């Protein structure tokens, strides 16, 4: 029998969260959102094209929302995610390389060996070169949704969102004619 290789494009995905809407969620709904996020990322070790690597935060309460989001995710990850031990080395190595080579890093958090969050100062067109796995995420605050244009290109596969209406998102992307984004 012959093997047939099926090539997959090297794609990435991003998510945007409206911080005010996230903070208004009752705890059980916030936990459901976190579980959905977990399923999109950790269940496939962030290897799926639809797994977000960059989380964008929009709103005036970003710091408070981020703290709650990552805390809830960390609590879930600690109890149900069991990656290989190499995860610790890979994530730490990635962080060190980023700290040395990337002057766009504002700060970072290591919540556990499988949850690293690197906060970017601003969005950058070459972000798509930073595909991650095993619970290593980049995040960035954005003031204007049009800034998403900095990270849209043909490699962008999926754009997930919370706290914005589907109608608004469809209109926004149609009007701004961003590159990439299959779904």
Please annotate each region the language model reported.
Residues 35, 42-160, 167-183:
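NAD(P)-dependent aldehyde/semialdehyde dehydrogenase
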Residues 1-61:
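Conserved NAD(P)+-binding/catalytic subdomain of aldehyde/semialdehyde dehydrogenases
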């Amino acid at each position: 029998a012959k093997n047939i290789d099926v090539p997959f494009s090297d794609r990435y995905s991003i998510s945007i969260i409206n911080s005010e809407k996230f903070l208004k969620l009752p705890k059980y709904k916030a936990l459901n959102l976190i579980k959905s996020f977990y399923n999109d990322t950790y269940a496939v070790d962030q290897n799926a094209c639809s797994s977000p690597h960059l989380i964008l935060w929009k709103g005036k309460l970003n710091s408070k929302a981020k703290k709650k989001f990552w805390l809830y995710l960390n609590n879930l990850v600690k109890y149900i995610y069991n990656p290989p031990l190499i995860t610790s080395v890979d994530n730490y190595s990635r962080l060190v390389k980023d700290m040395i080579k990337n002057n766009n890093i504002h700060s970072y958090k290591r919540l556990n060996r499988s949850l690293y969050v690197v906060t970017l100062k601003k969005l950058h067109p070459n972000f798509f070169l930073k595909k991650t796995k095993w619970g290593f995420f980049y995040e960035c605050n954005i003031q204007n949704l049009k800034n998403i244009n900095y990270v849209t290109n043909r490699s962008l596969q999926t754009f997930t969102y919370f706290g914005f209406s589907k109608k608004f998102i469809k209109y926004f992307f149609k009007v701004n004619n961003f590159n990439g984004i299959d779904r």
